């Protein structure tokens, strides 16, 4: 006894389509998470902290956290906009 459909294939859940804007934002923030903390580390190591690796690492951690907060803010704004839907247009005579 298995959960097979009469065609012999396993039943699948309906697939939701991924919106291009969501995928674009995910790729953008993934690239930012890869580039910005490393760039922040090396730039602050040489120009701001004069070779102090501890403070440069703290700066990189702060940069990564700012990117994460930015992603969460963008996600919440997008979710709130999708819940309310488009505003109805007012007709002027």
Curated annotation (Swiss-Prot):
Lineage of source species: Eukaryota, Fungi, Dikarya, Basidiomycota, Agaricomycotina
Highest taxon in the source lineage: Eukaryota
Membrane topology note: Multi-pass membrane protein
Protein name from the UniProt record: Vacuolar ATPase assembly integral membrane protein VMA21
Keyword Transferase: no
Compartment(s) where it occurs, according to its Swiss-Prot or TrEMBL record: Endoplasmic reticulum membrane; Endoplasmic reticulum-Golgi intermediate compartment membrane; Cytoplasmic vesicle, COPII-coated vesicle membrane
Cytoplasmic side: 1-21, 76-93
Main location: endoplasmic reticulum
Keywords: Cytoplasmic vesicle, Endoplasmic reticulum, Membrane, Transmembrane, Transmembrane helix
Known role: Required for the assembly of the V0 complex of the vacuolar ATPase (V-ATPase) in the endoplasmic reticulum.
Lumenal side: 43-54
Annotated TM spans: 22-42, 55-75
UniProt motif Prevents secretion from ER: location: 90-93
Any one biological process term the GO annotation gives: vacuolar proton-transporting V-type ATPase complex assembly
Gene from which this protein is expressed: VMA21
GO cellular component, one term: endoplasmic reticulum membrane
Classification via InterPro entries: Vma21 (IPR019013)
Entry's family note: Belongs to the VMA21 family.
Keyword Lipid metabolism: no
Organism from which the protein derives: Cryptococcus neoformans var. neoformans serotype D (strain JEC21 / ATCC MYA-565)
